[in-house]
Amino acid sequence: MQPALAPHPSAQDHADQVLHDQLLAAQHQHLTHPQQARPQPPAPQPPHMQPNTPARDQNNIDPAISGATMLTGPPQTPTQPDVTGQETPKTYGKRPLSTSKRAAQNRAAQRAFRQRKEAHIRELEGKVKAYENMGEAIKALQAENYQLREYIINLQSRLLDSQGEVPELPGNIDLSQPRSEIPVPPIPNSGTTTTAAPPPTAPQQPQPPHAQAPTSNDDMNSLNRIAVAGLGMRKPPTEEANYLGNNFQAQARRVRPDEGQTEASELPKQEQTHGLPLIS
C-alpha cells in the first residue's frame, strides 16, 4: 500500500503550484487593467483545472469524495449572491407600493365618510329648521284663529244690538211666532177733561212686552249656544252663552226703563175709573 501512495504528494504539489501561478497571473492582470469594474474571481478557475489533476490520479482519489466536491461545491458559491442581489430590490420595491396604496385607499375612504356625514348633518339641520318654521306658522295661525273667533262674536253681538232681529235657526227651535209691536195710544191734552171710561183692554197692554222678553232671551241663549258650538271655542260654551246672554239682558234693561216710563206716563191718563179730572 505504501508504494501506491507515493505519487500523491507530487500531484498535490503540482496542483498547488498551478494555483499559485494562476493567482500571480490574476494579480498581474488586475494591476495591468485597473479600469475594469469587477475583476474576474479566481475561485471559479480551480474547478476547470480539477479535471486535469484527477485524470492523472484517478486511482489515488476516492470517487465518493470527488463526486461530492464536484456536485455540491462549485454550483452553490456563484448562484447564491446573484439570487439574493436580484430578489432584494424586488421585495424592497413592492413593500412601499403596497403601503402607499393602502394609505391612499384609507384616506379616500375617510374623505368619503366625512363627506357623507357632513351631508347628513346638513340635511338634518334643514329638517329641524323647517319644523321650527312650521311650528311658528302653526302658532301664528292659532292666534289669528282665536282673534277671528272673538271678532265674529263681537260682530254677532253688535248685529243683534243694531237690528234687534234673530237670524234663522235650525228646525229643532221654534221661532214661528212673529214679534208684534205695542200700539201706543195718542196722548190727550191737559186742558180737556176725559170722562169716558177706558177700554177694558187698556190695563192689559203692558203685559205683552214682559211676556215677550223671556222668549227673546231664550232665543238669544239658544242662538249663542249654537254659534259657540259651531265655532268650537276653547272656552266652555256655557261661559260664552252666559256672556252673550248677559250682554243681551243688559241691553234689554237699558231699553226697558224708557218703555216703563212711557207706560207709566200713559197709564194714569188712561185709567180713570172715578170719572173725575186729574190735576197735573
Curated annotation (Swiss-Prot):
InterPro entries recorded: AP-1-like, bZIP, bZIP_sf
SMART domains tied to this protein: BRLZ
Region entry Leucine-zipper, spans: 124-155
GO molecular function annotation: DNA-binding transcription activator activity, RNA polymerase II-specific; transcription cis-regulatory region binding
Localisation per UniProt entry: Nucleus
Region (Disordered): 1-102, 169-280
bZIP domain boundaries: 96-159
One Pfam family cited in the UniProt record for this chain: bZIP_1
Main location class: nucleus
Family from the record: Belongs to the bZIP family.
Protein name as annotated: Putative transcription factor kapC
Organism of derivation: Neosartorya fischeri (strain ATCC 1020 / DSM 3700 / CBS 544.65 / FGSC A1164 / JCM 1740 / NRRL 181 / WB 181) (Aspergillus fischerianus)
